[in-house]
């Protein structure tokens, strides 16, 4: 006759394997998957900050080589133009000077930045450029030393403007590209070289910015 030991059976019953713990079934995503989610723009990703539209935070050398802090023009409406002496648009100097003379007492200023990136049409020295624009067009608005407005040596001022969102951003396409800056020092409009200084829409926009508080 076989005799069962109830104590052994009871002990065996208590050693049944436990089910897997809940926490093991709910493991978090592997770090690699989280990183991929962030890289693809997941909720933990952070967008790069937009470049500042304030562009008067630069010190430039004027046409005579003297350091000029652009912050001095804050409070004015500014038209920035990359100029050249041997360009088909060079005659715009005349219109720019007329516009400046007409509105300077209202708080408007033109800033000229000579550049030689387009067709090598500004080959002269700063002294040559000054003699040309003052002698030929009687320019009295502020002129600055020659800089690079595009390419590997692009000046930080134009690099900052190029980084702006469309339709303002991007390198100048040619000489006499124009950027309009409001009284707060923010670049607000872009005009291509074909836009003449007496263009009705350009003038209306300048008037609008001059009237703003």
PLM feature segments, named:
Residues 89-155:
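Structural microenvironment flanking redox-active thiols in thiol-disulfide oxidoreductases
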Residues 156-159, 163-213:
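Thiol-/selenol-based redox modules, centered on thioredoxin-like
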Residues 22-30:
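Bacterial N-terminal signal peptides that target proteins for export
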Residues 46-71, 156:
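N-terminal "domain-start" segment that seeds a small globular fold
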């Amino acid at each position: 006759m076989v005799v069962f030991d109830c104590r052994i059976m009871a002990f065996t019953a208590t050693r049944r394997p436990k089910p897997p713990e809940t926490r093991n079934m709910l493991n978090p995503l592997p770090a690699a998957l989280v990183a991929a989610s962030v890289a693809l723009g997941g909720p933990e990703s952070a967008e790069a900050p937009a470049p500042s539209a304030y562009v008067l935070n630069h010190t430039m050398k004027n046409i005579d080589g003297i350091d000029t802090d652009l912050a001095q023009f804050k409070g004015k409406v500014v038209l920035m133009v990359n100029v050249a002496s041997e360009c088909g648009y060079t005659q715009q100097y005349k219109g720019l000077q007329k516009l400046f003379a007409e509105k300077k007492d209202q708080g408007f200023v033109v800033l000229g930045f000579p550049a030689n990136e387009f067709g090598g049409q500004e080959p002269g020295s700063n002294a040559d450029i000054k003699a040309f624009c003052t002698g030929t067009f009687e320019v009295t608005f502020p002129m600055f030393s020659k800089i690079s407005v595009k390419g590997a040596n692009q000046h930080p001022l134009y690099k900052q403007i190029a980084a702006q969102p469309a339709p303002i951003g991007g390198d100048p396409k040619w000489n006499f590209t124009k950027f309009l800056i409001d009284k707060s020092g923010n670049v607000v409009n872009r005009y291509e070289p074909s836009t003449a200084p007496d263009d009705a829409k350009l003038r209306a926009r300048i008037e609008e910015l001059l009237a703003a508080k």
